[in-house]
Amino acid sequence: MNDHAPAPVAAYDLLRHEILHGALMAGERLRAADLRARYGLGLTPIREALLRLAAEGLVRLEANRGARVSAVSVIELRDLMRTRRAIEALCLREAIARGDDAWEAEILRAMHMLSRAPVPRSPDQRDQIAHWQAMHQQFHHALVAACGSPWLLRIWADLADHSERYRKLRLLANRSLPPSERDVTVEHNAIMEAVLDRDADRAVALMDAHLGRTEALVVDLLDDISELTATEGNTA
């Protein structure tokens, strides 16, 4: 984020970052006065930011009641991930066809940085979660960066940001993740090797399976939350 950005841009960047990274949770009320105090910005840029984020689907505006962080749902997640898999496959095929030695070197660098970031296993490891998430995003971006289409990359980046919101929800869930749940390092290495071998079909298949496993894990979490909420409602 740019520390010298105009106030409306700064407000948008700060709010978007906190929503995507779990500092502002799904369903949380967003009061303009509270956000002004939180960010040290005026009400006008805060309101402009809320309108922009509502257009992106990250904020829900409520008549005469302000705004809330948009809810998460299995339906939205499935739609989001289906779209991301399609776009990421297209980007990946184009990047494999177009990528040069510098692109390959950046993939190797990004994979090295990701492999050095410990996979978080507890919601208490917030700094570790943030670092791993950043390295993970960099790796996925490196894979598709040579696709040659600014439009595709913008669409991919937006889908990746929204899907990371769901991934972060799982990482911040009040449960520890068992080490045997899955080995994402093995998955990432397999994808990287297929990409560097210029085997587009294998790379796309591995990426589709990789994203599908993440989707399944988050769906399980959302189902558990729904069941818990229903149980609490029945016992209230």
Regions inferred by a protein language model and the residue ranges of each:
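Short linear motifs at protein or domain termini
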Residues: M1-A97, D220-A236
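Short helix-capping and inter-helix turn/linker motifs at the boundaries of alpha-helical repeat units
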Residues: P6, A130, E181-R182
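Amphipathic alpha-helical repeat elements characteristic of tetratricopeptide repeat
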Residues: V9, R85, L108, R182-V186
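Short amphipathic alpha-helical segments at helix-loop
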Residues: G27, V72, P123-D124, L172-S176, ...
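Short, solvent-exposed segments of well-ordered alpha helices
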Residues: A71-R78, R126, A130, R175-P178
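Conserved amphipathic alpha-helical segments that form helical-bundle/coiled-coil interaction surfaces
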Residues: L80, A97, D101-R170, E187-A194, ...
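C-terminal all-alpha effector/ligand-binding and dimerization domain
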Residues: K168-A236
